[in-house]
Amino acid sequence: LAIIYRLPPDLALKRKAGLPVEVTIASVEPYLSTEEARAGEIREGLAKQIIWADPANPSRTALSVIYIHGFSASPAEMRPLPDRVAEGLGANLFFTRLKGHGLADPDALGGATLGDWTADLEEALAIGRLLGDRIVVIATSTGASLVTWALARPVVSENVAATVLLSPNYGVQASGSFLLTGPFAARIAHLVIGPRRGFEPVNALNAHNWTTDYPVEALIPMAQAVRLAA
């Protein structure tokens, strides 16, 4: 049993990672709009989004910036920090949205998997390569866990020039958290934690930009991402 809990998470991807080869800098925004329309109702301003360095002339820049948000958060988590960084670098900017996040239905977070999130990250990196010659990655919390995994894989992290990891999630503090990456994790979480997890938002903006109440199953891919980064 101890050996099972030490094994890395199984990355059985159910979605093809990366970006279709036919997507160009001219078609990337329509592509994202089509993909996001399939996700369900996304809260205002929280969809995947490109901020062009020159909106009047959308074109490739020397550097691109991509932002990977944390668990239960959204692309708006650290704004305007990524915007300011991109502006200072004269870079195009891409905000990804990890599956299950930023949706009107909070239960959607419980349906996301680790494979979904690594696919979203790989897509973000591919878009970063499309938008710029080299990529600056900014990531927070569990987003930083995913980026740490990617940095160890040259094929995934190709053309990454710099990374900024804000409060990276390299360990779940709750006692017994290792159970979230082992057998029967969902059943154990229900018994120990209950059916749902969440927090009280401090204001309306916090409530909008975060999923503040979600199924306990959502903790499983978060814990797996931490293990993946180890």
What residue ranges belong to the model's regions?
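Gly/Ala-rich beta-loop-alpha elbow adjacent to hydrolase catalytic centers
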Residues: 138-147
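Active-site nucleophile loop of the alpha/beta-hydrolase fold
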Residues: 164-175
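Catalytic nucleophile-loop/oxyanion-hole region of alpha/beta-hydrolase
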Residues: 103-131, 136
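Short, surface-exposed "cap/lid" segments of acyl-processing enzymes
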Residues: 41-98
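N-terminal membrane-anchoring alpha-helices
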Residues: 1-26
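Short beta-to-alpha linker loops that shape the active-site pocket of alpha/beta-hydrolase fold enzymes
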Residues: 97-102, 169
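Serine-hydrolase catalytic core
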Residues: 49-59, 209-230
